[in-house]
From Swiss-Prot:
It comes from the Viruses. The lineage of its organism: Viruses, Riboviria, Orthornavirae, Negarnaviricota, Polyploviricotina. The gene is NSS. InterPro entries: NSs-like, RVFV_non-structural. Belongs to the phlebovirus NS-S protein family. This is Non-structural protein NS-S.
């Protein structure tokens, strides 16, 4: 089809660390011409389609594309091919968390909050919250590389395209486990939806780290403020296996 996009300003290059961890890192390199595979754009981030197909038909939700092994030609904005917006009622808290120092948050004895923050990357980080505050990646090469790296580490696909698909389906599974309807998650802003699920996990874990005899972290306080104004129906079944001070493995 003539309206399939093959042009790429930059291309992602995946590399794997030589140590036992085999951690994937993604760097974008200048390209500036037609690629041999279709190239989709998410908020300006180039995604070569070696394992999925490109769709030029607008749809309400990203999962509808992914279930057909497609990615939209361009999305992440209101005018993109994922029409419906991602949920926005945690936006203020997400922005506030993005400004916190993760080292400061982790020095408190809050093992359940720490575990909640360790999904889906397996280690506690505020990266997803930071990505959620960005309008796009066209002018932010470092953040684009970092976001693509995290997607590939979570999704563990052969390329950036199927890694994104596997990452999004990991999000859908987490919602299913928590008995939370997924219809509100459209995939227009993937980072924000991951942060949304992390906040649900935070609010579920919150009560297990409450102590009357000790101060709490700034992260805990922000989550507690959000919890106080959030309908408990949004938390689903509130499934959680509590950690204690004697058992803090995450």
């Amino acid at each position: 089809m003539s309206n399939i996009n093959y042009y790429a300003r930059e291309l992602p290059i995946m590399s794997t660390s030589p140590n036992q961890l085999k951690r994937v890192t993604v760097d974008f390199v200048p390209f500036g011409k037609r690629h041999n595979a279709p190239v989709s754009l998410y908020k300006g981030m180039e995604i070569p389609l070696h394992n999925l197909r490109q769709s030029v038909i607008a749809k309400n939700r990203l999962i509808t594309f992914l279930n057909n092994y497609d990615l939209p030609k361009e999305w992440g904005y209101e005018q993109g091919l994922v029409i419906k917006a991602s949920p926005s009622f945690f936006d203020v808290t997400i922005a506030r968390i993005s400004m916190l120092d993760v080292k400061d948050a982790l020095k408190w004895c809050e093992p359940n909050i720490k575990r909640a923050l360790s999904w889906p990357l397996t280690y506690p980080t505020f990266k997803i919250f930071e990505f959620s505050t960005l309008d796009g990646y066209q002018l932010n090469w470092e953040k684009k590389c970092d976001f693509a790296t995290q997607i590939c580490r979570v999704g563990k696909g052969l390329g950036l395209d199927d890694s994104l698909m596997f990452t999004y389906k990991t999000m859908m599974r987490e919602l299913s486990v928590r008995n939370i309807p997924a219809e509100v998650f459209t995939g227009q802003a993937i980072e924000k939806e991951i942060a949304y699920i992390q906040l649900i996990r935070f609010m579920t874990a919150l009560e297990h780290d409450k102590r009357d005899d000790c101060c709490q972290s700034e992260l805990f306080k922000l989550v507690e403020l959000q919890y106080e104004v959030t309908s408990k129906e949004l938390l689903g079944n509130r499934l959680w296996l509590p950690l204690t001070m004697l058992n803090q493995d995450i």
